[in-house]
Amino acid sequence: MRNLLLDQYATADIDQFVGKVLSDLGNPNPPLKLAEVRELLRLGKAFYSSTHDSAIREVAHKLKVAGQPVLARPTILKDIIGKLGLKALLLPDRRRILIDSEVPGQKQRWSEAHQIGHDVIPWHADTMLGDNKSTLTPACHEQIEAEANYAAGQLLFLQDRFLEEARSLSPNLDSVKVLTDRYQNTITTTLWRYVELNPGLAVGAISGHPHRPAVDFSPRNPLRYFIRSRAFSGRFSGVTEADIYAGIQTYCDDRAGGLLGRGEVRLFDNSGQSHVFQFETFFNRYEALTLGSYLRPSHAAVPV
């Protein structure tokens, strides 16, 4: 799945909303304390278990959605959580974020920030759970989720501060790991931001092990996520997931974990010209994370 790149008008508005939150917090240093963000926005937090009906019903007894008691529709939370695969949800009427307790600790941080993102974007109010006035098309839903993801990333990575620090480091996975520790976010979300906010030609991928495919692996959709910088998306719009995955397989070793390898991968731009990218892939025993950084045109001479 490709990352959806928002237009400049949406990002400018969201940057303004997030900037006000960070300013009101005194422009904190990393890592951002989400408890302080919730206190500022007067948001509460509670947990539910997606694997226990009784836990969902216990939460439902206490909540209202769009002004109506959830208890009047006792299966609403269970149905929504199950059908949509939700890991967290925002209940605006109650000023409450609900998080699935089954989600691993560090991933809960992203789920919480995503819901805060929905809360700080004013036009998301009419699309929240239970509002019968707004029925979202799949494309609109994708847009809304991308906007909340962008807001979450701008919060957790403190807007321009992350970009400035990323620029000061070498373009490799070691730098991504440094930023992961500094901002206390998952390496997956850090890689995503590192690539997506890169002003140059950068590409990232999150996939299974390139030499140990899962039972449900699809050659047509080999990547879990295909992340592109805005510059890469514009100049290399014809590059597919299959192209990236094929390149990854050329240099990766069949190791159980850690660095799987580095190598040069050739990709074709929109005019058909070949260019060389430096790729490297790390496997954390759950997913393979790949970063590709631009090196040179294929015909350029290599310094000796």
Residue ranges: model-predicted function:
Residues 1-304:
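Active-site hotspot residues in diverse enzymes, especially metal/ion-binding acidic/histidine motifs
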